[in-house]
Amino acid sequence: MKKMLWTAACALAMQGLVAAEHLEDKTAKAAEKVSDKPEIFLLGDSIRMGYCQDVKNELKDVADVRWPKENCANSQNTLIHLSWWKGIVSKPAVIQFNCGHWDVSRWDGDDEPITSLEEYGRNIRLIIRRLRRDYPGATVVFATTTTMNPNGTCGKNKRTTEDIRRYNAKAVEVARAEKVPVNDLFAFVEKWPSSDYADYAHFSKEANKRLGRHVAEFLKGQLKK
């Protein structure tokens, strides 16, 4: 029996090593720079996915704007996958990241958010420090999480604007302590009517263009510093 248990333990250990090596293999090398324009790197959830092309269009003459094709999801997922996304940029001048909608969500009817408030603050701090380590000289910007549709819909994974407000406050506290500029997207969209939303949290095409213009102007200002 002891021999069988030992064999099983060894097998599990080997699986762990293989999994770790698999993760290490995903670490990408920096991309080659293909433009003389400064690079801007956008990281974030589906809200970022909604406006990133508009940011690129707005800044086409002044910056090379890049982003991961996938949804960066919650703060822990973002932290874990930062090394995977190194191959997207070479030496970004500005990096804006956001995460929060997933973090505050009570997934599939859970009683608590996916990420506790304290865990969220810790993850934001670690993301900031990792980005600074991986991209020396880049200006790191934190973008706050946007509001829920004021009509009260919340989708399957419940979250509220009040939840978002609390988590934003924690993230901003961390960002300011780390001397990171904050792009307050929450404040920018807070008074938008329900007609600017496509569903419970995501924006219409026209609203995304407006949000993209705002993000572009903010990041353009960071390039000049």
Residue ranges: model-predicted function:
Residues 6-7, 52:
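General helical structural elements
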Residues 20-91, 95, 210:
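Serine-esterase "nucleophile elbow" of acetyl-processing enzymes
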Residues 2, 58-61, 79-225:
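Alpha-helical cap/lid subdomain in secreted, periplasmic
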Residues 8, 44, 99:
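Residues that line or immediately flank small-molecule/substrate-binding pockets and catalytic motifs
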